[in-house]
Structures are given as structure tokens and as C-alpha cells.
Design a protein with these regions (language model features):
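A short glycine-rich, Lys/Arg-flanked "PGG" loop and its adjoining helix->strand segment in the class I
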Residues: 191-203
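Conserved beta-strand signature within the Rossmann-like core of class I S-adenosyl-L-methionine
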Residues: 204-212
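Conserved alpha-helix/loop element of class I SAM-dependent methyltransferases that forms part
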Residues: 86-103
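A short SAM/SAH-binding and catalytic strip from SAM-dependent methyltransferases
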Residues: 176-189
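A short acidic, Gly/Pro-enriched loop at the edge of an enzyme's catalytic core
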Residues: 168-178
Length: 269
């Protein structure tokens, strides 16, 4: 229950003065002399804080849906500026190759970001195909819409879904293929999302997922993405036969998961 704490402002001020006083007496024990060891320890402490802040933010981005949306919105134009670095042309080519011929087909792009891959997909499905591009960041979708409108891609449907970490947007119709970049680590209910995707696909319909792993070689991966067999098992239980491959990058590695919707538990060849 709620309750009032007496002397909140005054108590905070007094406590702050007390802490500063202790620090001062530690660094300047005799007022005229400087304790170099204390100063070095203090510098080390501040350096650890400076290192810890970005690590904390990266962990928040990994695990907290609200933080994911806020960060993605804030960094939308920064993402656009660095899109060739974040999603290199070589990775895009591999994704399109794994997806195969989608000319005239319907493709769901689950997590389109600023439209980096969306533009390639829009060209690939021409002349009679359609791309459904969803994302949880409104600001990133504003950028995506501007880019596809500028190129006259009227066959691309852009959909904002703030609950994308837990579902496939209910307005998505049946599609021929699903592609997703950088979304597996954000999924809060992986099995539910995969089963919803399965319902939208025909038997033999392809899926291609790519995600980032070993961020800056120091950020821990989402647990289920750390083990290839676990990934295969989760996808198999959802009705997909998949391959899992890992490829090295400069600041992170890439996890490729690709395969098909199947009738029975048969290998994807």
C-alpha cells in the first residue's frame, strides 16, 4: 500500500552531503594531501559504470519489449544511416537466395525495420505479388513507407504492430513465404508466433530467419538461440523442418534458420 515518507527532500539532500563528505575524507585524508590510491579506485569505479551503462541498455533491448520499441523509435534514422552495416548486402543476397523465386507470390516480412530488405522483396515479387511488412516501431515504419512510396511500390502493405513480440498481426492473410531479420531474439512467445506463421503458409512454404548473436562478443545471447539443436526442436514442434547455420561477422555473428512447413517430421532437403 502507499505511504508517505517523512523528510524526503531534506533527507535526500542530507544523505547526499554525507556521501560526498565520506568521499572527500577518503580522497583527502589530511585535507592538504591527496590519497592517490583512493583516486585511482574512484576512477576505476566510474570507468566500470561507463562500461556497464551500454551493456545494461543492450540487455534491456534484448529482453524488454517496451524498451525495444522506445530504442527502435529513438534510433530509427540512425538505423537508416547504418543500414548497410547492420544488414550488409551479402546477407540480403543470401536471404533472397534462400527464399527462392517469389515472383508473383505473397511474402510476410516479420520485422521490416527501416525497409532495408523490404525494397528487395518488393522488386522480387513483381509484377503480381505482394509484401506484408510488419514492425513494432512506428518511426521505423514511417521511414519504410516513405521509401516504398518514393519507388512506387504500391504492392507493399506496411503494418504497425506494437505486440509483434507475442504474435503475428491478425490482419495478415495467407502467404507463400515468411522472412524475418533480427526478430527471433525479441520474441517473447516463440512457439505461439511460429504456429501462427505456420497457419498462414501452404505445405512446402518457405521460412527464412536471420538473427544477430554474440553481440560485440560479450553480450549473452537469448538462451534458446544459443543452441542449434534447441532451435531446430522449437521449429520442428511448430511444424517446420529447418537448417540452422551460424556465420561470423565483424561485431556480431549471424544465425540463419531456414526451411519449410511440412506434413510430417521429415528432413528439409
Amino acid at each position: 500500500r502507499n505511504f508517505k515518507v517523512p523528510f524526503v527532500k531534506l533527507g535526500t539532500f542530507v544523505l547526499l552531503l554525507l556521501i560526498l563528505g565520506i568521499l572527500a575524507s577518503w580522497i583527502f585524508p589530511d585535507f592538504n594531501s591527496l590519497n592517490s590510491n583512493a583516486l585511482n579506485t574512484l576512477k576505476l569505479g566510474f570507468s566500470l559504470i561507463l562500461v556497464g551503462i551500454p551493456i545494461y541498455l543492450l540487455l534491456e533491448i534484448y529482453y524488454n519489449p517496451d524498451t525495444i520499441i522506445k530504442i527502435n523509435d529513438t534510433l530509427a534514422y540512425f538505423t537508416l544511416l547504418l543500414e548497410r552495416f547492420i544488414l550488409p548486402k551479402s546477407v540480403r543476397k543470401e536471404v533472397l537466395a534462400l527464399l527462392g523465386d517469389v515472383k508473383g507470390k505473397k511474402v510476410l516480412e516479420f520485422g521490416c525495420s527501416v525497409g532495408t530488405l523490404t525494397l528487395n522483396l518488393a522488386e522480387s515479387v513483381k509484377p503480381n505479388g505482394k509484401v506484408y511488412a510488419t514492425d513494432l516501431s512506428e518511426k521505423e515504419l514511417v521511414i519504410t513507407k516513405k521509401r516504398i512510396t518514393k519507388r512506387g511500390h504500391l504492392h507493399v502493405v506496411v503494418i504497425h504492430d506494437e505486440h509483434q513480440v507475442n504474435r503475428v498481426h491478425p490482419s495478415i492473410p495467407h502467404v507463400n513465404a515468411v522472412v524475418s531479420i533480427g526478430m527471433m531474439g525479441y520474441m517473447q512467445d516463440v512457439k505461439k508466433i511460429l504456429k501462427e506463421m505456420r497457419e498462414l503458409l501452404p505445405y512446402g512454404g518457405k521460412i527464412v530467419f536471420v538473427d544477430y548473436a554474440d553481440f560485440f562478443k560479450m553480450i549473452p545471447n537469448v538462451a534458446w538461440l544459443s543452441n542449434d539443436r534447441v532451435i531446430e526442436k522449437i521449429f520442428r514442434e511448430a511444424g517446420f523442418s529447418v537448417f540452422v547455420q551460424r556465420k561470423k561477422g565483424l561485431f556480431w555473428n549471424y544465425v540463419y534458420v531456414y526451411g519449410i512447413k511440412f506434413h510430417e517430421n521429415i528432413p528439409y532437403v
